[in-house]
Amino acid sequence: MTLTRLLIRDFRNIAAADLPLATGFNFLVGSNGSGKTSVLEAIYTLGHGRSFRSIQAGRVILHGCDEFVLHGRLGQQENERERSIGLSKNRNGDSKVRIDGSDGGKIAELAKMLPMQLITPEGFTLLNGGPKYRRAFIDWGCFHNEPRFFSAWVNLKRLLKQRNAALRQVTRYSQIRPWDQELIPLANQINQWRGEYVTNITQDITNTCKQFLPEFTLSFSFQQGWDKESDYAELLERQFERDRTLTYTASGPHKADLRIRAEGTPVEDMLSRGQLKLLMCALRLAQGEYFTRQSGQQCLYLLDDFASELDTSRRQLLAARLKSTQAQVFVSAINPDQITDMLDGNSKMFRVENGKIEVQPQD
């Protein structure tokens, strides 16, 4: 499905906006601080229940207001009816999800209905940040590929939290075994899903990287979070004293990673900023295209500050690849000259200024 209409109320510096959207490219043009990134943030929040810029709800609510409200209309594909989704959140962080006019929906339902890929200047953490960012990349794919993944992941987090708390109190492994008896099968199952997903998507990533960065030989390897030759049950028992001293579980799926190297060297040590951005875009595009091929559902792409770190030829390469996906794309830019050659009959340009958003006529 595509997002055909977006309503925003009291979000960041946007008091009210009602945006009719193109099914292709949607360009948001304005100066720094105008609110163009806030539109991307609103779309992301509608599909995730949280912002990509702040974990505190109060920071995204317009000053002097009690809550923000977001609403989207999803256009139908073949044999599908039009859908509506809504999200409101107050300063205490309490959320209300509405789907097709009915309250009581879940954030996970929004994520299923509005799958998206986000590319921002801060997104370099996917490549040079800690393992949690690359786990999130893998888990996005598992969430959309395996219906049982989300509940297993939630239970894993719960059990790890309980186990870590218990490590502060127990003196013998037998006292913590009840948690491990639940944790071990979940850990093995999640590890299997993650490993299979990385195996399945690696060729897509490799092919996209060859187009974007043909000068490098890149490798991608899944690290499961413990010695792959070790049985996880035996490892937990063997490392009990160490875990008890640390007061947390040192090994497991919560330590998994995706190792990305160029010519055998970590990419953050080999690639320039512009090359890292292209690699980040390649990963997001490959994941979105793999998702579409597997599910038959399109993925949205959100690109903040499109031109940053990229010269003209690289911008053109990225724009051409995005167009080839035939997906809905939202792009922010400071200068309209950076995106005018991307405008066509299936796109719209919005001028954003001080939280006010207007559709711009196309010549």
UniProtKB/Swiss-Prot annotation:
Its main location: cytoplasm. GO terms for molecular function: ATP binding; single-stranded DNA binding. Pfam families: SMC_N (PF02463). GO terms for biological process: DNA replication; DNA synthesis involved in DNA repair; double-strand break repair; SOS response. It is found in: Cytoplasm. InterPro entries: DNA-binding_RecF, DNA-binding_RecF_CS, P-loop_NTPase, RecF/RecN/SMC_N, RecF_2. Keywords: ATP-binding, Cytoplasm, DNA damage, DNA repair, DNA replication, DNA-binding, Nucleotide-binding, SOS response. GO terms for cellular component: cytoplasm. ATP binds at G30, S31, N32, G33, S34, G35, K36, T37. Belongs to the RecF family. The RecF protein is involved in DNA metabolism; it is required for DNA replication and normal SOS inducibility. RecF binds preferentially to single-stranded, linear DNA. It also seems to bind ATP. HAMAP family: RecF. This is DNA replication and repair protein RecF. The gene is recF.
